UniProtKB/Swiss-Prot annotation:
This is Putative F-box protein At2g33655. Residues 1-47 form the F-box domain. It comes from Arabidopsis thaliana (Mouse-ear cress). InterPro entries: F-box-assoc_dom_typ1, F-box-like_dom_sf, F-box_dom.
């Protein structure tokens, strides 16, 4: 298992930039390095607002939309979850399912799971339980269509 200190600085910055603003206090008190990085990241966060998929107790975090942004595929799909958009949402989800393999992020209560694309062939998943000061981070080394990890 990789430690946060073993990851490249760019990847750590990318992961920490995806942490919700409400959770930044916990990040800053975790260690001195994270504190320094989070201060640097928070300055640029306004420009990055919304570039994540966050799930918390069956509700979608911030602005109640899903944003799929994978630069090397040039895909950007925004789905509004209001009642008037249910049909459009179903169509968009069909399009997403046909383009991507399903990835289930199962979270309980107010836990948060964040999916990030990093570089051209890496994905990072950050899991943060509601209670406690623990973050789990999984990073792929290469994205393969037939590769499955548990």
């Amino acid at each position: 298992m990789e430690k946060m200190s073993d990851l490249p600085r760019e990847l750590v910055e990318e992961i920490l930039s995806r942490v919700p603003v409400k959770s930044m206090r916990e990040v800053r008190v975790t260690c001195k390095t994270w504190n320094a990085l989070s201060k640097h990241i928070s300055k640029a966060e306004a420009a990055r607002e919304g570039e994540f998929l966050g799930i918390a107790k069956k509700k979608f975090c911030r602005n109640s939309f899903l944003l799929f942004s994978i630069p090397w595929l040039r895909v950007l799909i925004v789905v509004d979850f209001s009642n008037a958009m249910k049909d459009a949402m179903k169509d968009a989800m069909k399009e997403i399912r046909s383009s991507f393999q399903a990835m289930r992020l199962i979270v309980a209560n107010y836990d948060i799971a964040t999916l990030s694309a990093f570089g051209e062939e890496q994905l990072a998943v950050l899991f943060q339980p509601f209670e406690g000061y623990v973050m789990e981070i999984w990073v792929t080394t290469k994205i393969e269509p037939s590769a499955v990890s548990s």
